[in-house]
Swiss-Prot record:
UniProt tissue specificity: Restricted to hair root, not detected in any other tissues. Expressed in cuticle layers of differentiating hair follicles.
Protein name as catalogued: Keratin-associated protein 5-9
Region forming the signal peptide: none
Organism taxonomic ancestry: Eukaryota, Metazoa, Chordata, Craniata, Vertebrata
Species in which this protein is naturally found: Homo sapiens
Residue numbers spanned by region 8 X 4 AA repeats of C-C-X-P: 35-162
Amino acid sequence: MGCCGCSGGCGSSCGGCDSSCGSCGSGCRGCGPSCCAPVYCCKPVCCCVPACSCSSCGKRGCGSCGGSKGGCGSCGCSQCSCCKPCCCSSGCGSSCCQCSCCKPYCSQCSCCKPCCSSSGRGSSCCQSSCCKPCCSSSGCGSSCCQSSCCKPCCSQSRCCVPVCYQCKI
């Protein structure tokens, strides 16, 4: 009885062997025409569906680039750091997903837009806790909100309505 090779893809028809085939080698895994070395391959045949890697995922994430069959565990892509949202809790979207992006602040991440662009603060203040007007409850108008507003925001009389307060964040 002959043995089934893996050329042409993976699946139930791509694996298995009888007693005359010997043991499986270290190269007996993966998908595609070259996935079996030697050609006598024992089950299970590990396949990524679709085939994926850190480089093939890129900025897309792992949503459509994962899964496996044959009981072989997870595919490589799901284990890559570039397949994880980098700014999910900082005010930036998951579309900012690439390996160089997993840093605490969005301002350090080249693909993230500043999350506090309309709050009067600079991009260096880009995290979820600071995406609020800095003088909203201090008695000062929003026009008095500047990047330096962690200091008293009513130091100038034109900012005070009706009296001077300190910024409360």
